[in-house]
Amino acid sequence: MPKIKTVRGAAKRFKKTASGGFKRKHANLRHILTKKSTKRKRHLRPKSMVSKGDLGLVVRCLPYA
């Protein structure tokens, strides 16, 4: 049986935690930042966890994570 390919875009976006979850970065913090408030940018800064509903998709994209 052939090896399953990892989705390379997903491998760059998600990191697996020790407890089995996945860390992710928030969107909307790359450009056009002048119109966004400091509070909004500050809250987008820390990493977040992938939600339970999306976890299956991430696991399927990263078979060896």
UniProtKB/Swiss-Prot annotation:
<dbReference type="GO" id="GO:0003735">
    <property type="term" value="F:structural constituent of ribosome"/>
</dbReference>
<dbReference type="InterPro" id="IPR018265">
    <property type="entry name" value="Ribosomal_bL35_CS"/>
</dbReference>
<dbReference type="GO" id="GO:0006412">
    <property type="term" value="P:translation"/>
</dbReference>
<dbReference type="InterPro" id="IPR001706">
    <property type="entry name" value="Ribosomal_bL35"/>
</dbReference>
<comment type="similarity">
    <text>Belongs to the bacterial ribosomal protein bL35 family.</text>
</comment>
<protein>
    <recommendedName>
        <fullName>Large ribosomal subunit protein bL35</fullName>
    </recommendedName>
</protein>
<keyword id="KW-0687">Ribonucleoprotein</keyword>
<dbReference type="Pfam" id="PF01632">
    <property type="entry name" value="Ribosomal_L35p"/>
</dbReference>
<dbReference type="InterPro" id="IPR021137">
    <property type="entry name" value="Ribosomal_bL35-like"/>
</dbReference>
<keyword id="KW-0689">Ribosomal protein</keyword>
<dbReference type="GO" id="GO:0022625">
    <property type="term" value="C:cytosolic large ribosomal subunit"/>
</dbReference>
<dbReference type="InterPro" id="IPR037229">
    <property type="entry name" value="Ribosomal_bL35_sf"/>
</dbReference>
